[in-house]
Amino acid sequence: MNLCNSRFSVTFVRQCSTILTSPSAGIIQNRGSLTTKVPHWISSSLSCAHHTFQRTMNLTGQRGSRDSTGATGGNAPAGSGAGAPPPFQHPHCDRAAMYAQPVRKMSTKGGSYDYDLIVIGGGSAGLACAKEAVLNGARVACLDFVKPTPTLGTKWGVGGTCVNVGCIPKKLMHQASLLGEAVHEAAAYGWNVDEKIKPDWHKLVQSVQNHIKSVNWVTRVDLRDKKVEYINGLGSFVDSHTLLAKLKSGERTITAQTFVIAVGGRPRYPDIPGAVEYGITSDDLFSLDREPGKTLVVGAGYIGLECAGFLKGLGYEPTVMVRSIVLRGFDQQMAELVAASMEERGIPFLRKTVPLSVEKQDDGKLLVKYKNVETGEEAEDVYDTVLWAIGRKGLVDDLNLPNAGVTVQKDKIPVDSQEATNVANIYAVGDIIYGKPELTPVAVLAGRLLARRLYGGSTQRMDYKDVATTVFTPLEYACVGLSEEDAVKQFGADEIEVFHGYYKPTEFFIPQKSVRYCYLKAVAERHGDQRVYGLHYIGPVAGEVIQGFAAALKSGLTINTLINTVGIHPTTAEEFTRLAITKRSGLDPTPASCCS
């Protein structure tokens, strides 16, 4: 049992010091004459821990050990002179590795700071980092605050975007729309279904919000149980070790050895008349206290398309306004197939179009004027709801980052491979960092790994490559690895082979659902082992299909391994094992039947 290197080593050595120095302990402090009142492995470990404790309390000047002004110390360990005997070495203790770790001043023993770590942001990244840091012996506070939305004043509890206004409510409403579709398909499968069945928006919103509030509550309890101090306040830096927290009851100044910025982002609003006064964003949609009705969704990223998709499935009339391209950053062949599948379902797309203004009419409806950016032609239409989905902005403005000396790039924070900013004791994780995937699982893992490096002696870094993701449109799109365009750009068109095919889900046949856009492809190297660089899939339960293949891709999946894997029949996932036609061949990738 390697007690000196365990995650609780700091606490352990403190307790051991008390035992070793207590007159009633019955343990002689002379290393060579430990009594037999305790088993040998305990006595030797206690002696080792006592030595570690003395060194930890005395040693300063290493990276991570600073005085209250932030200056590094310069004192050598006691007893480190030329004539000092070598320290006791436990046979199972990697002392060299342990000594190489940063030495922190523990605030619980009169150190210079209120906390070892303050995490700014109570979302996925911040919570994961805070809880993991506590498990590794740090004293942690988590600062969290939500500004009300400008149009409706929407607020929410702890948990960040994903829990409150992102992944969770989005997936629930997507599921509600799929259930509505399934109900209408049920008649083809022999079910007697009332033709007048329709969703109740208010009941759906209430159910979604009840679930969110339960998650908020569980999260608060979890933070309390794990001894993370939760501070509901807006934080701004005074200097690199001091934060001013604005609370409901006033202000509070708090200090920490280390800060992790995990504030995430919020939706952008266009700079046009009426945008803020009358438009809403995804921050408002999932708690909207009225039916959305005829809705203009401005923006064709994944948020805009997902919202338009479930609104259509719930019986409303969405229109998508696209300034340039659909699903920027994704494989564009797949993106256009997704858009085409939505148009087939009756969702209009206004291409190459931007909004000019939003006006509220006497009847409460919204008059939107817009323009085609290619022809200059202007037009207008009336909607019940205007939903802005034009991108997100990092929440850096309220942090007063210049006071701490932290660099900002395009409202995001640039970091190195260890999530460190340009300031030695300040880190950033999650959606706030520049140039990394803005996905909840990425944020969670990055936050945990950062805490383990800071307080657990780990060296593992976050791997941001080949991260799988899913767009929850009516016909879902999931992918992992490189898009076809990026693979060509990185390796050259002559070095890339694309295996592709359309397929026919068995469950689509009886209700006679369209299979026109059920498509998948594997982007691979053309020669050699034909390693797979990217996998792309459009169809039902896309996220469930791609997850396992994501692990295979990260493990070095090749085309030969893929096509020689025996598939599970009949499933849509097995279609990846049947990819045999390349784009270069020019052959028709459309199957004759579900089993061909």
Curated annotation (Swiss-Prot):
Cofactor: FAD
SUPFAM superfamilies for the chain: FAD/NAD(P)-binding domain, FAD/NAD-linked reductases, dimerisation (C-terminal) domain
Record's cofactor remark: Binds 1 FAD per subunit.
Compositionally biased tracts (Low complexity): 68-79
pH dependence: Optimum pH is 7.6 for isoform A with Trx2 and NADPH as substrates.
Tissues expressing this chain: During embryogenesis, expression is seen in germ cell progenitors, developing midgut, hindgut and proventriculus.
Positions contributing to NADP(+) binding: V322, R323, S324, I325, V326, L327, R328, P355
Protein name: Thioredoxin reductase 1, mitochondrial
Encoding gene per record: Trxr1
